Amino acid sequence: MDISKIRNFSIIAHIDHGKSTLADRLLEYTGALTAREMQSQFLDKMDLERERGITIKAQTVRLNYTADDGNTYVLNLIDTPGHVDFTYEVSRSLAACEGGLLVVDASQGVEAQTLANVYLALDNDLEVFPVLNKIDLPAAEPERVKHEIEEIIGIDAHDAVLASAKEGIGTREILEEIVKKIPAPQGDVAAPLKALLFDSWYDQYQGVIILVRLFEGSLKKGDKIQLMSTNKAYEALKVGVFSPVMVEVPQLTAGEVGFVIAGIKDVADAKVGDTVTLLHRQCAEMLGGFKEVKPMVFSGLYPIDTAQYEQLRDALAKLKLNDSSFSFEPETSVALGFGFRCGFLGLLHMEIIQERLEREFGLDLITTAPTVVYRVHKMNGDVYSIQSANQMPELQSTEYLEEPFILAHIHVPNDYVGGVLALCEDKRGVQREIKYLTPTRVMIIYELPLNEIVLDFYDRLKSITKGYASLDYEHLEYRRSDLVRMNVLINGEVVDALSLILHRDKAYFRGRDLVSKMKELISRQMFEVAIQAAIGSKIIARETVKAMRKDVLAKCYGGDITRKRKLLEKQKEGKKRMKNVGNVELPQEAFLAILKVDDK
């Protein structure tokens, strides 16, 4: 194939700015799909992606387009996720491209994640050109948004394409711009194979399918390939492209994007960002710029029915096949039994994994409160990391604790600035700067502790700003903090699954709110139930669920007071004995209460 006729591009956009719909229009216009096969958001294969209107996994599709100059070009669209948790997926997809379409909603303007992804694209030396989407909306202000793009991102936007993916306006102009503005890939077909593995997933019939972008050389069916980070060798059983269904081709050459099926059994061997080369004719060095992704948020997942433990293990292993950024290891809890401690990139990632477990595998799960990775500095100089409150050592042997901080960029309309600043201060934030991007839009930059973000920050930010805020964050460093472990005791017994690590200043309020919430959720027993929050041996809050009372005097119509007293004493003794041996059933809502308690 003539390498000068290939264009590899991706679409960069904030959530809800119309990226997947635009991809649909490009598929339709180039004839990759007939109207009958068309379903909205074609590239979002998971139901979950379509329902939430977000793109989770990277997808690719090859489009054939005959341009105005009479030549037929091969356009490889590499669809990227737009959410902050999936930044690594975005960086891999972008590394496989030469250019990108920056899609901005003409009514909303530049949002926080648009910025983050554009900077990633510019770091990868991509040629980026702007497209203003949704120009059919009455609220669209193309001139203001063009000005915003130039001011904030610094990309020339005077000739930005005006489009409406929903109405199909501007599709041809976008395809022409792709051909004219995005450079053709460079690469020597005769050189040894050097290909970037930018996504992989597991197919139950064919094993691991890997998506590759060839930078040099060629690859055909039957070639022996090697993955350079693990040095494992495989035979390429099938090579092909997505157009948009899988189509086998005789060979892939430099500049092309396609899939390889090589009988790989484990996705952990097909690391995203790895370099694929030929076993007997290797390239000199790996492609650079890739890192192992580390989970930032941890949470315990336990089956409500303990018989589902093995099913949960299998389900997690299957999800891990498709998601190299997700980790899990077994753990046990006195209150919840056997389960797994899982690591996620962020909150959305956690919700999605959880929802997929329940939806695709039919599991009923209890989730413990999310935590982040803390560093413990012991008196003897040892330093180690902990992921849950149960791993936290006694304070006597600990010199100090450190927690991760993030740098948050929050874009909000200026009417809501006061509320957002109050929220950030409440979450122990340190203000860096406030920038007026336009007279009506403000960018607020704050340093915030990650553990304040993981619980309910995003929900509260959205409710304060009526849904208009957008948030993007990057990790800064670990900082020393006055952190304590707060335990919840039910009738004097610590419930390990409800323990939390939090800042000492917040502990009293948090404890008080949590026990009052628990009081509402725990049903009344035949005996009194004491719910306490404690730091060490000091009780900081308490609520009592009163016992149900049977009227033992009902059958005494008169008679002596001593008779009544005897019956009451007998009841009291019985309740006391019951309290010693009685167990309290904690409903699933009790564990969710931790996530939902607002720091008022």
UniProtKB/Swiss-Prot annotation:
Keywords recorded for this protein, A-Z: Cell inner membrane, Cell membrane, GTP-binding, Hydrolase, Membrane, Nucleotide-binding, Protein biosynthesis
UniProt-listed Enzyme Commission number(s): 3.6.5.n1
Cystine connections: none
Main location class: membrane
Enzyme class: hydrolase
Catalyzed reaction equations: GTP + H2O = GDP + phosphate + H(+)
GO MF term list: GTP binding; GTPase activity; ribosome binding; translation elongation factor activity
InterPro entries in UniProt: EF-4, EFG_III/V, EFG_V-like, EFTu-like_2, G_TR_CS, LepA_C_sf, LepA_CTD, LepA_IV
Residues covered by the tr-type G domain: 4-186
GO cellular component: plasma membrane
Topology within the bilayer: Peripheral membrane protein
Gene Ontology annotations of biological process type: positive regulation of translation
Residues reported in the UniProt entry to bind GTP: D16, H17, G18, K19, S20, T21, N133, K134, I135, D136
Domain of life: Bacteria
Compartments in which it is found: Cell inner membrane
Role summary: Required for accurate and efficient protein synthesis under certain stress conditions. May act as a fidelity factor of the translation reaction, by catalyzing a one-codon backward translocation of tRNAs on improperly translocated ribosomes. Back-translocation proceeds from a post-translocation (POST) complex to a pre-translocation (PRE) complex, thus giving elongation factor G a second chance to translocate the tRNAs correctly. Binds to ribosomes in a GTP-dependent manner.
Family of the protein in this entry: Belongs to the TRAFAC class translation factor GTPase superfamily. Classic translation factor GTPase family. LepA subfamily.
Name the record gives this protein: Elongation factor 4
UniProt organism field: Trichlorobacter lovleyi (strain ATCC BAA-1151 / DSM 17278 / SZ)
The encoding gene: lepA
